[in-house]
């Protein structure tokens, strides 16, 4: 069996199936277990805690890496890059911010994989600026739906992605270009297991990692909002609740003004100030 140190570093060459099985054997952490481990790492520099955190999240890296299989790169390499992002996330994670590690780590995992794809998908880089990178990853999804673009479709894509039609044409041209020696020769991968079909299949049956990320982010946002509301005075808190959080009815400024014996304009001012305070508290 692959030991902990091996599974942390790189995907075992030619044995990706075994790696995935082992990664999935590691139990997922409860909230309390995760908090204890992240605090041990952050405040005591406990490397054993870091190792456990990384091992218990490898399954998420595997899942995320499958979403990038369409670029013709080995899944083992994508996983390796994702693992680097996971390690960076574990090192930077603050257990006091109130979100689960997986929510924080998704950004770092995707960021490392993005960089790897951009470095290796073409010998000549196709995306060097921030806007080009956004277009690169989104254009592949759009092209699966539309195929080759005509002028009208270029305009549609440009509007959808918030870029110019010129950028769309240029990126489509770059992505359609052929590179010399893009695919490695068979001699470079003598072991047939290295090119097993699992490395090129995208898992479309679930969206587990994104689902966990979304659920935890929504929980984090709700907790931040509740905490921010408690910082408001009682009247401001009631105004915000009545205007924005009451699902049963929409309270008008005048209705609230009548309850407090003030003008509707004064309620509007209080609401505006309260919203500013909430925004600052939530973004803090």
Curated annotation (Swiss-Prot):
PROSITE patterns cross-referenced by the UniProt entry: SIGMA70_1, SIGMA70_2
InterPro entries, per the entry: RNA_pol_sigma-70_dom (IPR014284), RNA_pol_sigma70 (IPR000943), RNA_pol_sigma70_r2 (IPR007627), RNA_pol_sigma70_r4 (IPR007630), RNA_pol_sigma_r2 (IPR013325), RNA_pol_sigma_r3/r4-like (IPR013324), RNA_pol_sigma_RpoH_proteobac (IPR012759), Sigma-70_Factor (IPR050813)
GO function terms (MF aspect): DNA binding; sigma factor activity
Gene3D superfamilies reported in the protein's UniProt record: 1.20.120.1810, 1.20.140.160
Biological process annotations from GO: DNA-templated transcription initiation; response to heat
This protein's UniProt keywords: Cytoplasm, DNA-binding, Sigma factor, Stress response, Transcription, Transcription regulation
Region called Sigma-70 factor domain-4, residue ranges: 228-280
Motif (Interaction with polymerase core subunit RpoC): 77-80
Signal peptide (residue range): none
Positions of the UniProt region annotated as Sigma-70 factor domain-2: 53-122
Subunit structure, as described in the record: Interacts with the RNA polymerase core enzyme.
Family note: Belongs to the sigma-70 factor family. RpoH subfamily.
Record's function text: Sigma factors are initiation factors that promote the attachment of RNA polymerase to specific initiation sites and are then released. This sigma factor is involved in regulation of expression of heat shock genes.
Protein name: RNA polymerase sigma factor RpoH
Organism name: Buchnera aphidicola subsp. Acyrthosiphon pisum (strain APS) (Acyrthosiphon pisum symbiotic bacterium)
């Amino acid at each position: 069996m692959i030991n902990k140190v091996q599974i942390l570093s790189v995907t075992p060459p030619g044995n990706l199936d075994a790696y995935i099985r082992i990664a999935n054997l590691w139990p997922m952490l409860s909230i309390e277990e995760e908090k204890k481990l992240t605090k041990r790492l952050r405040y005591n520099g406990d490397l054993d805690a870091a190792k456990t955190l990384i091992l218990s999240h490898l399954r998420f890296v595997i899942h995320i890496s499958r979403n990038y299989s369409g670029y013709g790169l080995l899944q083992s390499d994508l996983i390796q890059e994702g693992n680097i992002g996971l390690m960076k996330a574990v090192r930077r994670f603050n257990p006091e911010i109130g979100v689960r590690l997986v929510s924080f780590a998704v950004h770092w995992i995707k960021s490392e994989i993005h960089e790897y794809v951009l470095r290796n998908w073409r010998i000549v880089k196709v995306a060097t600026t921030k806007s080009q990178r956004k277009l690169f990853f989104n254009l592949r999804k759009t092209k699966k739906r539309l195929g080759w673009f005509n002028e009208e479709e270029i305009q549609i894509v440009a509007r959808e992605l918030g870029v110019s039609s010129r950028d769309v044409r240029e990126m489509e041209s770059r992505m359609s270009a052929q590179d010399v020696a893009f695919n490695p020769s068979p001699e470079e991968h003598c072991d047939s297991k290295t090119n097993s079909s699992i490395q090129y299949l995208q898992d479309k049956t679930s969206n587990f990692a994104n689902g966990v990320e979304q659920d935890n982010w929504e929980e984090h946002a709700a907790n931040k909002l509740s905490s921010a509301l408690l910082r408001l005075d009682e009247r401001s808190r009631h105004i915000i609740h009545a205007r924005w959080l009451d699902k049963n009815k929409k309270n008008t400024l005048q209705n609230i003004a009548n309850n407090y014996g003030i003008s509707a304009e004064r309620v509007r001012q209080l609401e505006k100030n309260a919203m500013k305070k909430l925004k600052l508290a939530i973004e803090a």
